[in-house]
Structures are given as C-alpha cells and as structure tokens.
C-alpha cells in the first residue's frame, strides 16, 4: 500500500499597515528621574552653569574699587601707601587681597571693623568731605607723624586723620563739632592713642589722666588711654584704637579731649547706595564685562544654577553643590534595531524610536502597495514643543531669582558665632541643592510621562478612526482589512478617515480570514491524529520484526500455548 502525505503550505500575506511611533536620534544625553537614573533622551537642557572666564570684570559697566596692597582700613584712614585711593569714583564692588600689606601702619586695632565691612556691601560710592579742618586746631600741633607710616624715610601719618599733640608745653582741652547738613548719612572715624609709658604720654600730650569723649544724638562714648609696656610693632610700643559711627542727617558729632585724640579731618558721605560687596582675591581687573562676579572669575549665563563658587556679587544664579542638573526636553531615546526591520523592531510603541522620522517628535510609518514612508504629526509635535518650552522657561524663571552671597566678617571674639553662621549657611545650601535636584527629577519624570501620553493619545486617535476596519497587531501598528493607498493613509493621519467607505470591504476580508483560521484548525487536527496513529503502527511493526528475528536465530524462545 502506498501512503501519500499531503503537505499544505500557507503563505501569509501582510495587508497594508500603519504604525504610530516617535522620533529617535544619535543623542547620548542622559537625565535622571524620580524612578530611573541615566535615561538616554533625544533632547535635554543643562540648567547648571559650570564655567567662568577666570577674570575680574566690570559689573554692569561699572569697574570695581581695587584696593591693591591696601586694606579697607588703610583706604579709609588714608595710609600714606594708599594715596591713589584718596579720591575714588563709584564702584560696583571692592577688591581686597587676602592679606594686604598696607593697613594700620601705626599698630593698633579698628573697633567694629567687620561691621564696617558689612556696611560697605550696601554702598557703591563715598564722597569725601572735610568736616574738621586741620587749621581749626590752633592751640595744638597738627603735624604729628610716625616713622611707622614713613614716606621716603620721613615720618608721616594717616592722610584723613589729624594727630593732635601739645603745642609748646600745653595741651588745652580740644573741642570740635560737625553738623551733618549733607543730606545723607556720614561715616565718621576717630581714634585714641595708647602710649607705651608715662614718658611718652607727657612728651606728646603733657597731661596725664586724659580722656577722649565723642557724642551724637545716639552715641555717648568716653575713652581713657591705656598706658602699658607692649612689644614693639613697626618700631612702636604704643597703639592706636580707631572707632567709627554713622552720623545721621542734621545730627551733630562733638569731640572733646584733654589728650591722645586722633581727630577726623574728613568724613565719608554715603552718596550712593546699592548692592556691592568685598571680593577677596589676588586677581586684578581685566577688560571685560559681566553681570555676575565670583572670586574665581566672571559668570555670563542665563541659567538658574551654578556650582563655581559660593561667594558671588551681581545678578547671579543660585549656587548649589550639584555636579549635574539636566532637564529632559525630548523623548526617551531608544532607536529601533535596524537589522530586525521596522515592524519587527518595536515590541510596543514606546519601546523603539524611529531615526528616519526627523521632522517631528511623534508620527506615522505606513506600508502599502505604493511603498512605505514616515510622516510626522506636526500638530501634536508643536503642542508638545510649546508645552515643554514653556515649562522649561517657567522653571528657569522661577528659580532664576538673582542672588548675592558675600562673605561675612567676624573678629577673633566671634569665632563661635562664625562657626554657627557657617553651619547655617551650609544647611541652607544643602536645602537649595536638594530642592534643585528634586525639581529636576520631578520635571524629568513628568516630561517623559508627557511624551508617552502623547504617543498613546495619537495611537488612540487612529484606533478610534479605524475601529474594526483594521486590527491591532500589538506593536503600535494596525493592519488594514482593506486596501489603503496613500490618499487613504493621509486621511488616517489628518483625522478625516472615511470609515463607511471601507466598511464593506473590511467586513468581507475579515470574514475570509476567520474562515481560513477555522479550516486551518481542522487540517491541523487531522494531521495530528494521523501522525499519532502512524507513529504507533510503525512502533508495533518494528517490535514484531525484532522479535521474529530473535526467535529465528535462537536468541529468543517462542512458545505458543493453546
């Protein structure tokens, strides 16, 4: 008997298809989200400035006041080595070296010096005004000087101060006053000399048991010289102690002394207030402009954050400790696997992007008898671009509050306060850094979810148009039950697909496909049964043949019992 096996081959012919997908490119930009790290995206925006120009620049067109080798005290008192600072124009900020050489040439101290520096962070210009002319002290010698402040080997003194000493053998009570009619607050500085011993006291002032008294409407200060033997500094065993006050408009300051007074010749009218600061750096001014200055260099940026230096002056981004703050603006960048082809590459429409679609974020790929191609969905892409652009700009605008962070000065008696201040500032900085990083993580999560939602919406838009005229094939694609030429494809893309036009054709093709599926099931069942029976029969014949052969050669004894 001859058995003929009939092998049926079914060739599956794919119908016209349209897929929804999104753009992909060669970008290696990575962002972090709340749930993921190092997510590759097609587009991103860095909002953390990391660079500076390494220069000191004019701030908004106004140069800084460079003190050079002089300190704040040397400038205001008039150290002879600081003569170039006797008259200074408006400044944007003050540049002081870390350890300037020319401060108090005559050794001593400056009371409330750190508070004075803090005052200077709110001032951008002083007008120097003569308040107690040197020639008014007719009963005293006003040419006092010291070799500690020598110029060209000759004794000298602070240019803005007058050291009153005895005239002949007399030092009558010295009195002077100034009425502030300038219309602005006036910075007034004075001093008291503490001699090394009684001999020096009598040599300079004749009197012993002297005092220096200063009074305003809010100040009443009386100081007594402290005569003591001290180590010599700059060749001097004596010390000078300087104090200052802000004299209000129409207020009067009165000086009275029986000896040891360092009287002011000039006061400093606060002629212009503004945001300033003291920049501690060894750099010098260069020919450049900026809106934000740090000790390391100028920052020119519109970004809301920077990590260059915590101390800044001008319109500056907020300093954070972060190394990276990147906002996602594009989509997840997962290019399709080219070797697998378009329709085999995408397991889901948010699992693989199309590098071939370059004119939009979201769009379509179609395949029909006329060919295949990509087409971006311009409307959804533009809405997404506008939405994300507005969001990024809003984030930058909200966080781009301009800050100035100038260093605070503390004297040796305030170290505990300084340490507490540093801890507080570090705490605030940690909070700002955390807020910035959390903001970026949350916005990136929302942006990527936004893109996924837009692709899903586009998919649903197509699905609702096609209804049962096409089937979903589970990869972001639809296979039509009817022929769909380029005009038909375009109608699907622009939302004008005519469902009734293709309904009858789709219905017929859909029924035929169902019939083929049923007949296929019958054939498969018959083949399965036949294969089982044939296999069993073959096994039985094989066993019988082996048994017969073994019986014939004596290897197997066969007994037939009746």
From Swiss-Prot:
Protein name: Hemagglutinin
Further comment found in the protein's record: Major glycoprotein, comprises over 80% of the envelope proteins present in virus particle. The extent of infection into host organism is determined by HA. Influenza viruses bud from the apical surface of polarized epithelial cells (e.g. bronchial epithelial cells) into lumen of lungs and are therefore usually pneumotropic. The reason is that HA is cleaved by tryptase clara which is restricted to lungs. However, HAs of H5 and H7 pantropic avian viruses subtypes can be cleaved by furin and subtilisin-type enzymes, allowing the virus to grow in other organs than lungs.
GO molecular function, one term: host cell surface receptor binding
Role, per record: Binds to sialic acid-containing receptors on the cell surface, bringing about the attachment of the virus particle to the cell. This attachment induces virion internalization either through clathrin-dependent endocytosis or through clathrin- and caveolin-independent pathway. Plays a major role in the determination of host range restriction and virulence. Class I viral fusion protein. Responsible for penetration of the virus into the cell cytoplasm by mediating the fusion of the membrane of the endocytosed virus particle with the endosomal membrane.
Organism: Influenza A virus (strain A/Mallard/New York/6750/1978 H2N2)
Subcellular location: Virion membrane; Host apical cell membrane
Subunit-level organization: Homotrimer of disulfide-linked HA1-HA2.
Family: Belongs to the influenza viruses hemagglutinin family.
Transmembrane regions: 526-546
